[in-house]
Amino acid sequence: WLDSVSTATTLQNSADIIRWNTNKEYLTELVEAQIGVIPTTFVRSAEDLVTITNEGMLERDIVVKPTISAGSNNTERHEESPVKAAAHLGFLLDAGFVAIVQPYQRFIDERGETGMVYFNGQLSHSFRKGAILATGENEENGLFTVEEITPRNASGQERELGEAVMSFVKKKWGEYPLYARVDVVRGSAGVPVVMELELAEPSFFLQVDHEAPSRFAAAVMARR
């Protein structure tokens, strides 16, 4: 689809950027760039599943998800439920996915996530997203989880982390994308870590800042 659309029109976030970003294995590159990311274990095979089971990873409070998904689809939290976690991972592997396992970040229950939206590499606005994963399968409205979004000013540490991510993206691809969203949460050490980098049609949540739509329009016009 990306190749087809690229020949018919101009993608401001290029096909290569979107293709790279739609697979959460990009997180490994952020780690290699010494950017703080939630600890992430990739499960690619039944052998990997046996290994993490023997290590006791599934006995903890964890989040399991596929590397390629949208709207938290097939994402579940397993709170010290190794049998259910193993079944979920087995389901994802059988479906042909690579899966990831991350420790659940308990600070998210207190203060949610912070999302920062960037247009042409500049921070436009930020917001708070409430915790959406209860233990077990998350509730969904169709394919997408219902989200609680409210205005929030990103902290200095969060902004520094977001800027580091955007600098990495520019260095890797030679330019800033038209739009980007960096979702962060306070990690176990009390400092922000990246949950996700969204470069493929993320929700901008423009409603949290009445000037955000104008900033996005200006960013689009600046590329003409």
PLM regions: where:
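Short strand-connecting beta-turns/loops that link adjacent beta-strands
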Residues: 69, 121, 189-190
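Short glycine-enriched loops at secondary-structure junctions
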Residues: 17-20, 131-132, 185-187
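A short, surface-exposed helix-loop junction/capping segment
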Residues: 13, 69-71, 143-147
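ATP-dependent carboxylate activation and anion-phosphoryl transfer catalytic cores
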Residues: 156-224
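Phosphate-binding site of ATP-dependent enzymes
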Residues: 77-172, 193
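Active-site nucleotide/adenylate-binding loops and adjacent lid/helix of ATP-dependent enzymes
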Residues: 1-8, 15-111, 156-163
